[in-house]
Amino acid sequence: MAPRALRPKIALQMLPEGDDKDLAIMTAFTNRYAKVSNTFMCSEPSVTAVVIKGLADHRATLGAPLCPCRFYEDKEAEAKVGYWNCPCVPMRERHECHCMLFLTPDNEFAGESQEISLEDVKKHSNI
């Protein structure tokens, strides 16, 4: 039996404490997922920042990064179902992001960046 391939080791950054922890996690997730999915962030950084902030808030309060751009009768129930947890099913299946967080290269609002810094998220989301 051949040995299992080893996964590359990922250097973990020291995460900030308190409120910034979920924001740092969701920022890192966004940067990684944009690259993996070959999508781009909105050309207007405040759109990206506000969505990441909403995802971080939901992660902190609900335990899951529930899409912040939709209305829910019961957020806790929706978070448990997982359909609208980021990346949501429409994004995973069809590359359709209602929040404009992950945009295909041909989208008129897509910027050139697949990365945003934690500092820029804070700056553009008025934290």
Q: Which sequence ranges carry the predicted segments?
A:
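Long, distal/terminal scaffolding or interaction modules
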Residues: 15-127
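N-terminal chloroplast transit peptides
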Residues: 1-14
